[in-house]
A protein has these predicted regions:
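Substrate-binding groove of N-acetylhexosamine-processing glycoside hydrolases
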Residues: 48-320
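Catalytic alpha/beta active-site cores
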Residues: 1-64, 75-87, 161
């Protein structure tokens, strides 16, 4: 239908399994070796590309491939060999659980004839902040600034399923994509707060947003050069901690937490530094609870002073 009606289309090639898992999780006879797995993907995506070329009649149709989870690992190892071309769009994906430029992007050969894309989860049910924003616009900017050093950004995706709580972060990304050179997160935040809460309260609200994000427990020191808050203990991690500890409440262990299913990197589900998870959790929660309590109290005090028409959005997007 797309070809018959001559609709512009950005085609996608991929080979993954059911439920957003690697294909070898779906096929019992799949190879066990990473290189052999990548060889199968390499063949499959070239078959798909040939089908697209035949259907469109174009030698260089606009096609993208997204390097998600296992694909990014295979690409970083050099096993995955995606097609190249002037209209081929390689979409790199921020690291799972904690969102930062991953190894495949860091090692990307910038001489390849491809266009560059980036996919970052601001909110995602299984891999990051879920009901409360946590990444923040500063971290978003740091990600995209780095991406742009690897080549001109052609395509961008920010993922968020729960929109209400993530409006500010998504707005920041939209502003940055509109004019990356001029964008500055601190300036954007003042503009955003002026628009929704008035100039009188803009600086006060902007400071609250900043202090909210920096109240999160950073359970592991940053490893990516120049990136603040690379690892943060967002709400999805809290939820999983309560679930896992609850199931083993009667049997004490200093390390009761375990990786979620299909976790490819050991320890990535929680990324807690140290050899005693319980002690680390208690120490981390003591610090972050005080910071969040202070931000919460300031929010409540400001809420009473805001114009009535601005209170609901303030409550939904920040105070709650």
């Amino acid at each position: 239908t797309v070809c018959r009606d001559k609709q512009e289309n950005l085609w996608q090639i991929a080979f993954r399994g059911v439920n957003d898992q690697p294909f070898w999780a779906a096929f019992s006879d799949a190879p066990k070796d990473d290189k052999e797995r990548a060889d199968i993907i390499n063949r499959m995506i070239r078959i798909q590309l040939a089908m697209i070329k035949k259907a469109t009649g174009e030698e260089d149709p606009f096609v993208r491939m997204t390097f998600y989870d296992e694909l990014s690992d295979l690409l970083a190892k050099g096993y995955l060999q995606p097609p190249t071309g002037k209209n081929m769009l390689w979409t790199f994906v921020a690291g799972r659980r904690d969102h930062y430029p991953y190894d495949d992007l860091v090692s990307f050969d910038t001489t390849k004839q491809v266009k560059l894309g980036y996919y970052m989860n601001l909110q995602f049910t299984s891999t990051g902040a879920h009901l409360a924003p946590a990444e923040g616009p500063w971290k978003m900017e740091a990600n995209y600034r780095y991406v742009n050093t690897r080549g001109p950004l052609t395509f961008s995706v920010v993922n968020a399923g729960n929109l209400r709580e993530f409006v500010m972060e998504m707005s920041a990304n939209a502003r940055m994509m509109w004019d990356m050179q001029a964008y500055n997160t601190d300036s954007f935040l003042i503009d955003f707060c002026s628009q929704y809460f008035g100039q009188k309260y803009a600086e006060e609200v902007a400071k609250l947003y900043h202090d909210y994000y920096y109240a999160y427990w950073q359970q592991k020191l940053s490893e990516f050069p120049g990136m603040e808050r690379q690892f943060i203990f967002q709400d999805l991690r809290y939820s999983r901690v309560f679930d896992q500890i609850g199931k083993r409440f009667s049997d004490f262990s200093p390390n009761p937490l375990y990786d979620i299913g299909f976790e490819r990197v050991p320890g990535r589900s929680f990324r807690i530094d140290g050899n005693n998870q319980v002690d680390s959790l208690i120490a981390g929660m003591k610090k972050t609870a005080v910071r969040f309590e202070e931000v919460s109290q300031r929010c409540e005090n400001l809420l009473k002073r805001l114009p009535k028409q601005d209170q609901r959005f303030f409550r939904d997007n920040l105070a709650a």
